[in-house]
């Protein structure tokens, strides 16, 4: 495969525009936030980056790769990213689905025959599906940090584990409970369906097309002079964590990558928004990538991580496909995942509606830099460096809005093409009285301001009038011809 043309095409796609590039003062605050965290967290090495408009706009390495050699961390230093690896496995499954090679709703035993003899916790339990494994709803027990230490398990040992079966925490499909074992099983599905190891499949089908040449799973084969070695902080000093070789559980947490490589991954994911008519330019379709934010039906409502800001913030959160999806009170939709591993901690925040991502990798056991990453995102938001791209006004919405203007100018609801519900909900005479009352209160309105689309079928507007402002909403009916099913008008507060 010719990588350069594909990468160039990927980076040339349209991204939602930032309100403004991060200014020097904001970047200085972000740098200080990460630097302070590294010292307080006793992380030997740290690298972080900000991706916007399809490129790495800011990246910085702090500390050292190796406490003995004092080699400084750079954007090309290799870190293990632990559970942030799950996103690669999830997209590998979705790619195989797109290629017609598996079904998300098929029993997992269809692709892993060792599961066929399993004993389920209740007689009315349905069989585990591939989708259950992706969304952590298979009924397995939460297995941190047991799962991390299974990294070195051989494929033969994993086969025996699968054949023996595992105890269930609950019946499949009843709740979300995080399972590294489940994602290791997805790795086996990738291997069985593709005919390659999951490592080779993900490198060939996802990493290589994105130009992630330094990324992979086998840390013992990586350039050792570029690796950030893992440490734990114990008794006031750094203690080297032993490297765990690649194994069967790597599908849940085995990826090693650099900031330079990972920025390509983040840019690719963000390029899936907004939905548009542009040619496809990546290893998976944009619509497939957007599936990662479709959460399972087990929402939570936690408070935002303590220490991120002085403002309390309750979030809505669910787990989707290799990602947590959060609705934040300040940042809006955030697609995120952390990684914790012996010797490493990591986090990524995607703000898909703004086309911006923040990520960070550290070389301390379970020392994930979530706190400074969230603070960095809030600093970008406060600086006006995040902006949701406006939706285009569809031709049908433009026609509906012009009809709403005609209603106002003529004082008659029947001046617009109406869906059959409108006059049943409020007759023409009542509409006439309502419009007249509004005109008496606000006077003449030029109605020249544009409509703001909230979808292809609906929009809002504000008109400046002689004695105030009028706000409104216009909504098309789901009919082939443009008809209005709703027109709301009200006087804006002073």
Question: What role is predicted for each listed range?
Answer:
Residues 14-16:
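N-terminal signal peptide c-region/cleavage motif recognized by signal peptidases
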Residues 22-79, 101-103, 114-118, 155, ...:
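Short, conserved catalytic-motif segment at the N-terminal edge
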Residues 36-48, 68-133, 169-181, 250-253, ...:
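Short active-site loop at a secondary-structure junction
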Residues 62-67, 120-340:
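Short, surface-exposed loop or secondary-structure junction motifs
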Residues 299-305, 332, 360-430, 494:
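Short, gly/Ser/Thr-rich active-site loops of penicillin-recognizing serine hydrolases
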Residues 347-350, 354-364, 471-473, 484-489:
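Short, well-ordered beta-strand elements
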Residues 412-454:
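Short solvent-exposed beta->alpha transition segments
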Residues 452-494:
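Exposed beta-sheet edge and beta->alpha loop/turn motif
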């Amino acid at each position: 495969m010719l990588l350069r043309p594909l990468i160039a095409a990927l980076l040339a796609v349209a991204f939602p525009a930032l309100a403004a590039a991060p200014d020097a003062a904001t970047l200085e605050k972000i740098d200080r936030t990460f630097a302070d965290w590294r010292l307080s967290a006793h992380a030997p090495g740290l690298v972080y980056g900000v991706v916007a408009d399809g490129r790495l706009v800011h990246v910085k390495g702090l500390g050292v790769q190796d406490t003995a050699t004092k080699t400084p961390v750079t954007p090309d230093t290799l870190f293990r990213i632990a559970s942030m690896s799950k996103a690669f496995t999830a997209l590998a499954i979705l790619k195989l689905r797109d290629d017609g090679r598996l079904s998300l709703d098929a029993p997992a035993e269809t692709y892993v025959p060792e599961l066929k003899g399993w004993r389920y916790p209740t007689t009315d339990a349905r069989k585990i599906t591939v989708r259950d494994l992706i969304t952590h709803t298979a009924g397995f027990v939460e297995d941190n940090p047991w799962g991390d230490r299974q990294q070195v398990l051989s494929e033969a040992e994993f086969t025996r584990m699968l054949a023996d079966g595992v105890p269930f925490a609950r019946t499949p499909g009843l709740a979300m409970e995080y399972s590294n074992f489940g994602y290791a099983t997805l790795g086996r599905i990738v291997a069985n369906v593709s005919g390659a190891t999951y490592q080779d499949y993900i490198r060939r089908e996802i990493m290589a097309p994105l130009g992630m040449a330094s990324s992979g799973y086998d840390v013992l084969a990586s350039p050792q002079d570029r690796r950030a070695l893992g440490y734990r902080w114990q008794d006031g000093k750094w203690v080297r964590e032993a490297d765990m070789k690649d194994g069967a559980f790597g599908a849940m947490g085995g990826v090693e990558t650099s900031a330079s490589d990972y920025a390509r991954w983040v840019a690719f994911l963000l390029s899936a928004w907004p939905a548009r008519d542009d040619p496809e330019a990546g290893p998976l379709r944009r619509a497939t990538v957007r599936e990662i934010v479709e959460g399972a039906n087990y929402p939570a409502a936690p408070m935002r991580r303590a220490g991120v800001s002085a403002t309390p913030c309750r979030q809505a959160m669910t787990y989707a496909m290799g990602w947590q999806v959060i609705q934040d009170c300040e940042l809006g939709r955030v697609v995120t995942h952390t990684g914790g591993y012996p010797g490493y901690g990591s986090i990524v925040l995607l703000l898909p509606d703004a086309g911006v991502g923040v990520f960070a990798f550290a070389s301390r056991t379970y020392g994930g830099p979530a706190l400074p990453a969230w603070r960095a995102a809030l600093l970008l938001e406060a600086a006006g460096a995040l902006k949701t791209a406006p939706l285009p006004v569809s031709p049908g919405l433009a026609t509906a809005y012009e009809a709403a203007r005609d209603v106002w100018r003529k004082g008659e609801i029947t001046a617009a093409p109406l869906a059959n519900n409108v006059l049943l909900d409020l007759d023409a005479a009542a509409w006439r009285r309502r419009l007249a009352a509004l005109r008496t209160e606000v006077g003449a309105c030029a109605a020249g301001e544009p409509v703001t689309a909230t979808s292809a079928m609906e929009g809002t507007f504000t008109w400046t009038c002689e004695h105030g402002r009028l706000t409104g909403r216009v909504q098309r009916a789901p009919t082939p011809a443009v008809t209005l099913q709703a027109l709301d008008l009200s006087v804006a507060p002073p």
